[in-house]
Amino acid sequence: MSDENNNGRNSAPGGRQPLTLKPRAAGSVSSGTVKQSFSHGRTKTVVVETKRARTHAPAGGNLAAPSAAERRVFEPQKPAGPAQAPRAPQGAGDGLSAEERAARQRAIELARQQEADRRAREERARAEAEAARAAQQKAAQAAAEPPAAPPPAPAAPPAAAAPAAPAAEAAPAPKPAPSPRPVPPSAPAPQAARPAAEAPPRQAGAGQTRTYQPSPDRRDDRPSTTTYRPERPSNRFDTSTFNQRAPRRDDDRGPRPPRRDDDRGPRRDDRPQGARPEGGGTVRYSALAPRPAPGGPRGPGGPRGPGGPRIGAAAPPATPEIQRAARQAPRPGMGVDRRPDEDDRRRDPGKAISRAKGAPNRREGRLTIQAVAGDADGAERMRSLASVRRAREREREKRKGGAQEQARVAREVVIPDVITVGELANRMATRGVEVIKFLMRQGVMLKINDVIDNDTAELVATEFGHTVKRVSEADVEEGFIGAEDVDDHLLPRPPVVAVMGHVDHGKTSLLDALRSTDVVSGEHGGITQHIGAYQVRLADGQRVTFLDTPGHAAFSAMRMRGANVTDIVILVVAADDGVMPQTVEAIQHAKAAGAPIIVAINKIDKPDADPTRVINELLQHEIVVESLGGETQAVEVSATQKMGLDDLIENILLQAEVLDLKANPDRTADGSVIEAKLDKGRGAVATVLVKRGTLKRGDIVVAGSSWGRVRALLNERGEQLQEATPSTPVEILGLDGTPDPGEPFAVVENEARARELTEYRQRVKREKAGAPVASASLADMMAKLADKKVSELPVIIKADVQGSAEAIVGSLDKLATDEVRARIILSGAGAINESDVLLAKGAGAPILGFNVRASKQARDLAEREGVEIRYYAIIYDLIDDIKGVLSGMLAPIQRETFLGNAEVLQAFDITKVGRVAGCRVTEGVVRKGARVRIVREDVVILELGVLKTLKRFKDEVNEVQAGQECGMAFEGFQDIKAGDVIECFNLEEVKRSL
């Protein structure tokens, strides 16, 4: 991944001067370049500088020059061999001092000598290796004489002991070799000694202080240990260098004791002592320049440096393969593990590796960890940290005497309606495999992504020792309607009164008399087809809210909604008609809602009025008035003559006082939707009744599956209001759709909450609409499919208000039979538009408009596409038309009419005619062209179809009366026997109606 070239020059890309460490003292900073390789062949060269520790002179003054003995001990040992003439120093134009040039010259000479020695060793045969080592040991023992001088003080490295001039290097002298450990004798092999030039120390000039380079680290003088501790893998890009330690000061502690190389073996972490790279740069090893192998030939140097003895018995055990592969760079003050299988073509660790272009050992190809470790084929793959931890945990459990099962932590697991196995395992903090195993033991084969229901999930969580909290999507509805109010916050509110009864009994006329209005004259057909809400202010200032409900049978849902939101029900019964079916239905709705009933006997001004009959008929439905000892109030009124209205209002107020109606106006509003419609100019308009709280402009309202911000509040007279208090009916504008009548509405805190509620309700509505309708039984469904097909009449219904559309749909559903039914493609409130016409064309359905009209564009499109649009103002007419169409779709009934019987006396075979039956008519008449069947022993054998041949004697006749004989021939049936009975009959088709 990186190349390094430490040549002492700044080589920033682009010719710019790189960032450098300041101040830059001579010899204190070494710079180099690192070439980084990335994927897709991209590379980048960066400049790296290494700052070495600077030495400081003692406070006493100049340091004394080292003696000759000191120089002999601390001079770097060079391999024995013929001395080579030193090169002439380079000119001063290279920017180097004399000491640096001398150090560079020595490093180059040493590298050349080591290269020559390596090539010589490669050429020697394996048989001469032991002899060469024995000769080397013998020569080392001869030169191991201890020096006569006392132990020397720390001496400068080779770079500090450079000569002042090339002429001072003329006197070569052999270096003292360290004392090696004894080895078995072997065949001696002569080896020429290689003398090395030694230069006298440089003399300091007048007024100058001679500075020494840092001495080798003496921490390695501690006794070695055989305890093996695996090292942490070091970074191969570690830029730490050797010998970065200040020289030892000459103080009162005396001279440094001599090295103890003779009485101990080399340690694993011994540092190299060979020549350093130029400028003291970082020593790096790579796959092309690896560390020397243990036990192999070494370069010149001390016991731990190049050329020193091999590691003896005191060395620690071999480092594991994984750790050797991970350790890429030397650590300060420590040696480097060496692989025994590495060849001896290793350079001196102290020599800087050249990265010049065209080098013979230049790295090629992709750089990998295996290539850096030197064993690209056999290196083991590094284990992950989690794998190592698990292995250590298993080892620890084995030492403890077996694995101990970890205690499970009980948690509260939240389980929705449906959940996957993987999600359940995550919530229980358990592996998914454990959950799958448990389910397999229960006989359930599931995968990690399979979905299970909440009951199964609860069983699994309980089995694993957790507590379960079940949640559902319906929980979003919680808190929609606020909590109950405290009694201290309640204030009196107006009563809500619903007027109910049979059609044409005078409900709307009674309300007109109370409100002094004329609503009846504006209604189509004189009947109420919408539910109306009005608030009447009485003479004493009190207010009463009235709900006018339709009396037609189709508006049963409207009457039920009116009874559910009301406080008091006024049951209007005509004195001349008495109790009718819708009157009974209104009584049932009032009882179901638990609302008290006030009976208003209307039309008492008519001549045939009989209030007593009405009271007696109500007894059959458990309505006992006060005159008969009951609790139900009864008032005789006349809406047209305005008779008894004051008594009716007095009874309403009395009943409201008994009920003690109260509400809290200082809270968010909620209530019920009474009616909804789609207005062309105002959009969706909903009529609501506030039950609690105060509804204000700007509130965010959720009603059913619709929501919106209230843009306007309108009363029944079209006046705008700023707020609506409890028991006030108002129209609200601003909803995004028309809610269903009867849906509760409430004010929510923000739009996010409103969207959450409406999206859930819309999703539930879609699921219900898409769910198939369950049949009574599988047998019935199969019978319908096999015997006959249900005929459907597709229709599209558009009404002025949502309640009317709902009533029409309910009425058409009641017309359905096993053979025909009306299929509602679309129903809603609003005018007929182009989208409705296109939908009707695609479905082949007519459009039924109730109190609405189609726009001009929709009419033109319907004429072009051939779509039928029918308009209705009265619900009776619409239902009757649809009933007639459905009746025409019914298959006619075939009615059988008996004509007569004829007994077969004898059967004859006639040529070209076949078998002919001679018969006598025993009953009725036998006619030609009628249908006949063969009856044998009172069992119908065959339906023969139409009788085509009937003869009396030899003449063709149309009919034969009873008591006469005739002959009959049948095509396709020749098995006529004497004694058979031929039954003659006719089939008639009769139309049916619903």
UniProtKB/Swiss-Prot annotation:
Give compartment(s): Cytoplasm
Region described as G2 = 526-530
Q: Per the record, which residues fall in region Disordered? A: 1-405
Give me the ranges of the annotated region G5.
638-640
Q: Which stretches are tagged as biased composition: Gly residues?
A: 298-310
tr-type G domain segment(s): 492-662
Which stretches of sequence are listed as region G4?
A: 602-605
Q: Which residues bind GTP?
A: 501-508, 548-552, 602-605
Note down the stretches annotated as region G3. Answer: 548-551
Listed A to Z, the keywords are: Cytoplasm, GTP-binding, Initiation factor, Nucleotide-binding, Protein biosynthesis
Give me the ranges of the annotated region G1.
501-508
**PROSITE patterns for this protein:** G_TR_2, IF2
NCBIfam families per the UniProt record, alphabetical: IF-2, small_GTP
What protein does this entry describe? Answer: Translation initiation factor IF-2
Lineage, top ranks: Bacteria, Pseudomonadati, Pseudomonadota, Alphaproteobacteria, Caulobacterales
